[in-house]
Structure formats: C-alpha cells, structure tokens
C-alpha cells in the first residue's frame, strides 16, 4: 500500500515551525495505533474561519478549536483537520500551558478521532485524554 502524505496549510498568518518534526511525530502516533497513513491535511485558521465552517457544515453556532472531516477508509487514515490557532492560544492561556503543547494536543486529538476514539461521554473523554498524553510523549525533537 502506498503511504499518503501529511500536509500543513494556513488560512491565516500562522507558520508551523519544525514541520517535519510534527509530520514524523504524527506518523509515529498513527503507526502506534496500527493504522496506516493516508492523505491528511491540517489547515490552520482563525476563529471566524472555523466558526463559518462549523455553521455551514455542522449547523453549530459556536467557536471551537478543531473540526475534523474524517475520510478514513478501513485502517488508512485520511481527511482534513481544521484548527483555530486563536482558540489554541486562548486554551493554552486558560490551561496555563505553552502554545506548542496545546497545539500538539489539538493536532493529535484530530488524529485520534480518525483512529476511532470518541469524546462524547465522560469515559470516552478520559480515554481520549490518556491517549493524547501517550501520543504527546512520542514527540521528540533532536537539538
């Protein structure tokens, strides 16, 4: 099976530093769930851009940090993940954490949804948090 690509796009002025490190980490996280890498796009945007998508496609009149459109086929993960960098920054401030740490959590949250993990019930949320922590621990940057 041909391996897909993980790509990063920006609809605002956000620039993801160390793109290849993030790509390698996401690939490692996907493989750790015994899944395959299809074409996955992360699209960074602002609150208004994501709010418009939330209204148009999900009929939700709320701001959110992430919306994922899952096109996974079998065990091959693919789809589009929209992330509001404004909301990530606000969450980082609220949770007293660094922007990069909160961004990792949101990035991997979308991937975990593609892997089949849900977060509607309290039990599902607890498992999602554990999985997020497990995958964040896989992120290593060589200095």
Curated annotation (Swiss-Prot):
Q: Which GO terms describe its molecular function?
A: metalloendopeptidase activity; RNA endonuclease activity; zinc ion binding
The record ties this protein, via InterPro entries, to: MetalPrtase_cat_dom_sf_prd, YbeY
**What GO cellular component term, any one, is given?**
cytoplasm
Q: One Pfam family, short name please?
A: YbeY
- Cofactor details (free text): Binds 1 zinc ion.
Q: What is its EC number?
A: 3.1.-.-
Kindly list the biological process annotations in GO that this record carries: rRNA processing
The Swiss-Prot or TrEMBL record lists the needed cofactor(s) as: Zn(2+)
Q: Which UniProt keywords apply?
A: Cytoplasm, Endonuclease, Hydrolase, Metal-binding, Nuclease, Ribosome biogenesis, rRNA processing, Zinc
**Cellular compartment(s):** Cytoplasm
Q: What is this protein called?
A: Endoribonuclease YbeY
Native species of this protein? Christiangramia forsetii (strain DSM 17595 / CGMCC 1.15422 / KT0803)
């Amino acid at each position: 099976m041909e391996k897909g690509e993980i790509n990063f796009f920006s609809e605002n002025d956000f620039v993801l530093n160390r793109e290849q490190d993030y790509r390698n980490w996401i690939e490692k996280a996907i493989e750790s769930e015994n899944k395959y890498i299809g074409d996955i796009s992360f699209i960074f945007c602002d609150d208004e851009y994501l709010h418009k998508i939330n209204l148009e496609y999900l009929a939700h009149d709320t701001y959110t940090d992430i919306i994922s459109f899952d096109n996974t086929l079998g065990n091959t993960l693919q789809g589009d993940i929209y992330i509001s960098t404004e909301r990530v920054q606000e969450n980082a401030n609220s949770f007293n954490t660094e922007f990069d740490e909160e961004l990792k959590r949101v990035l991997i949250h979308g991937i975990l949804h593609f892997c089949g993990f849900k977060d509607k019930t309290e039990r599902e949320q607890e498992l999602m948090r554990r999985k997020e922590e497990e995958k964040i621990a896989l992120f290593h940057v060589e200095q």
